[in-house]
Curated annotation (Swiss-Prot):
Bifunctional enzyme that catalyzes the decarboxylation of L-phenylalanine to 2-phenylethylamine, which is then oxidized to form 2-phenylacetaldehyde, a constituent of floral scent. 2-phenylacetaldehyde is a precursor of 2-phenylethanol, another constituent of floral scent. Its cofactor is pyridoxal 5'-phosphate. Belongs to the group II decarboxylase family. The keyword Lyase applies. GO terms for cellular component: cytoplasm. The lineage of its organism: Eukaryota, Viridiplantae, Streptophyta, Embryophyta, Tracheophyta. This is Phenylacetaldehyde synthase. It comes from Petunia hybrida. Its EC number is 4.1.1.109. It catalyses: L-phenylalanine + O2 + H2O + H(+) = 2-phenylacetaldehyde + H2O2 + NH4(+) + CO2.
């Protein structure tokens, strides 16, 4: 029989013992962590917004193996500041205007801390009843807040669940729609299923379609144009469906968007849903970013027609000041989802589940284990109240309007898409570049604006990103970081203007 071999690295070494969950150690280290983060937020503007490091930088700084002996929290936090901070892009910086916001808040962070400290695994009601029931209650609260029809709420026969990301939500709803359709046509016809979206729909939808087993060639990305403000044209959808029907295919699923990633275009829900209903197509409404704005009554008209859809989602972690991750999904018929995803092995059997009087959220998602996400959103709603949350969002939209006005007043620039929420899309215009450099085509204009954006980002002062729509390169300026105020908007515009002036005068 082989003997146990002792690693000489450990043989004879004295190892310090430490408690894994000592209350006093937690209190001391927790205070230090809170102070560390508070100092970070206080000094966040001192850091370049986008990380300036090169790939592989961290491997050169850290040892090639884990420490044998424990290290004090003071040293660990020192290492965070010296080694980790240079590799951070600071999403909470007031000068972060890239992508869409991933906005945080004191309540959101403390809610995350509370959830992590309790560390319950709420896959079923019995596993932690409060986790399940608070999630159901908060989902109804939030649904009422954005004025979702009662049919989406638990109180009206529907229901909501918190998942990680939009991609997870899309996958779950596609699978629910797929299984429901194949019950009618037979599983052997899965290769005939077709899904529809606009060419502006978030790219995660295509990933979800691929994972769900739908053939890649049966994904219809219907082109949009500036004439419809890059929203999905209902007649274009109808033509695509009719062509597929003639080819013997089975229309399955339509993903609509309220606030597309590139330009925050809004698809016309009502006519799209009416067409989908004619053909028995499941309609999902993705409002990942813009859904948060719908807590304000003046933006709820963008959801007109959602009563005709099957499911709706938005990300509270984007613009509702709740830390990543927290994607909220509502369904009018949750049984379609649970029928597709439910499992009930003997190890999870219990009287509450067997009674069918409780929600088991394991059957509403891909994974079994799940976090206590509702706790942080509950804290956000309670700590700030609806009135303050609405005003935070309105202030971001007003700041975006201010930036848009600054751009419009400079004749060298042009606004490239309607500003529906807090995103402004702009560029240095073809006319300005034609006057200065005799540019005559969009390729040259695109190249100039790409160089302008990189110059702006390299300064470290602000961070913005770009998109390309109909072959046109445009710079995206998204307001939504929790610390942003008007001076940051003015500073960002000065950076844009000064870098443009420098390049135009070169």
């Amino acid at each position: 029989m082989d003997t146990i071999k002792i690693n000489p690295e450990f043989d004879g070494q004295f190892c310090k013992t430490t408690s894994l969950l000592d209350p006093e150690e937690f209190r001391r280290n927790g205070h230090m962590m809170v102070d560390f983060l508070a100092d970070y937020f206080h000094n966040i503007e001192k850091y370049p917004v986008r990380s300036q490091v090169e790939p592989g930088y961290l491997e050169r700084l850290l040892p090639d193996s884990a420490p044998i002996q424990p290290e004090p929290i003071e040293k660990i936090l020192k290492d965070v500041r010296s080694d980790i901070f240079p590799g951070l892009t600071h999403w909470q910086s007031p000068n972060f205007f890239a992508y869409f916001p991933c906005s945080s808040s004191t309540a959101g962070i403390l809610g995350e801390m509370l959830s992590a400290g309790l560390n319950v695994v709420g896959f079923s009601w019995i596993a932690s009843p409060a986790a399940t029931e608070l999630e159901s209650i908060v989902m109804d609260w939030l649904g009422k807040l954005i004025n979702l029809p009662k049919t989406y709420l638990f109180s009206g026969g529907g229901g909501g669940v918190m998942q990680g990301t939009t991609c997870e939500v899309m996958l779950c709803t596609i699978v629910a729609a797929r299984d429901k359709m194949l019950e009618k046509f037979g599983r052997e016809n899965i290769d005939k299923l077709v899904v529809y979206a606009s060419d502006q729909t978030h790219f995660s939808f295509q990933k979800a379609v691929k994972i769900s087993g739908i053939k890649p060639e049966n994904f219809r990305a219907i082109p949009t144009t500036k004439a419809t403000e890059f929203s999905l044209n209902p007649e274009s959808l109808r033509r695509a469906i009719q062509e597929d029907k003639k080819a013997g295919l089975i229309p399955l699923f339509l993903c609509t968007s309220i606030g597309t990633t590139s330009t925050t275009a809004v698809d016309p829900l009502k006519p799209l849903c009416e067409i989908a209903e004619e053909y028995g197509i499941w309609v999902h409404v993705d409002a990942a970013y813009a859904g948060s704005a719908c807590i304000c009554p003046e933006f709820q008209h963008f959801l007109d027609g959602v009563e005709h859809a099957n499911s709706f989602s938005f990300n509270a972690h984007k613009w509702l000041f709740t830390t990543l991750d927290c994607c909220c999904l509502w369904l009018k018929d949750p049984s379609s989802l649970t029928k597709a995803l439910s499992t009930n092995p003997e190890v999870l059997r219990n009287d509450a589940t067997d009674s069918e009087q409780v929600v088991d959220y394991k059957d509403w998602q891909i994974t079994l284990s799940r976090r206590f996400r509702s706790l942080k959103l509950w804290l956000v709603l309670k700590s700030y109240g609806v009135a303050n949350l609405r005003n935070f969002i309105r202030s971001h939209i007003e700041m975006a309007k201010h930036f848009e006005e600054l751009v419009a007043m400079d004749e060298r620039f042009e606004i490239m898409a309607p500003r529906n929420f807090s995103l402004v899309c702009f560029r240095v215009s073809l006319l300005a570049l034609e006057k200065k450099f005799n540019f005559v085509d969009e390729t040259q204009v695109n190249e100039f604006n790409a160089k302008l954006l990189e110059s702006i980002i390299s300064s470290g002062n602000v961070y913005m990103t770009h998109t390309v729509v109909e072959g046109v390169y445009m710079i995206r300026f998204a307001v939504g970081a929790p610390l942003t105020d008007y001076p940051h908007i003015d500073m960002a515009w000065n950076v844009v203007r000064n870098h443009a002036t420098m390049m135009l005068n070169a």
